């Protein structure tokens, strides 16, 4: 008969404790409304264009307590140009399936925003200007989960549009 030493017993207890604690997942302490934070943009300036001539990648982080982000059918990432607040651009966050017992999720989202036209004081746009060599804007961003909860709204750094 093989006698189990104290150190072997401790190893087995530690292993059992590790397996049990790994099997028990706690739901993260995130609220059910999505929360987003601005991480950055790949460019601080772009050349004006009305046909997607230039772009920048915007990165945000997110948390969502019930993990119901993304939708197959709706546009749920809203990006608003600070110069034209009534006309937001809408994007689709890919569907994230709800899995496991701790349904809270966190991660990062990156999306391309294409160049836009310079808007001049007289309201004209999209032509080169020596009088107004640059225009600037920032984006306001928010997301919505499948339950209809809106996130907080975040602001990007300023982006300079080169009016060439």
Q: How would you label these PLM feature ranges?
A:
Residues 20-23:
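C-terminal motif of bacterial Sec signal peptides marking the signal peptidase cleavage site
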Residues 25-28:
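Bacterial signal peptide processing site
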Residues 9-16:
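Sec-dependent signal peptide recognition
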């Amino acid at each position: 008969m093989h006698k189990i030493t104290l150190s072997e017993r401790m190893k087995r207890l530690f292993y059992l404790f590790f397996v049990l604690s790994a099997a028990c997942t706690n739901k993260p302490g995130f609220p059910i409304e999505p929360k987003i934070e601005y991480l950055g943009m790949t460019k601080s300036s772009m050349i004006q264009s009305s046909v997607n001539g230039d772009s920048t990648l915007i990165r945000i982080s997110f948390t969502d307590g019930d993990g119901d982000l993304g939708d197959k059918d709706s546009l749920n990432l809203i990006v608003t140009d600070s110069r034209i607040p009534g006309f937001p651009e809408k994007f689709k966050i890919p569907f994230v399936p709800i899995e496991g017992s701790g349904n809270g999720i966190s991660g990062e989202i990156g999306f391309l925003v294409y160049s836009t036209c310079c808007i001049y004081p007289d309201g004209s746009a999209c032509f080169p200007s020596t009088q107004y060599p640059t225009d600037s804007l920032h984006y306001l961003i928010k997301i919505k989960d499948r339950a209809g909860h809106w996130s907080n709204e975040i602001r990007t750094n300023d982006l300079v549009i080169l009016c060439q």
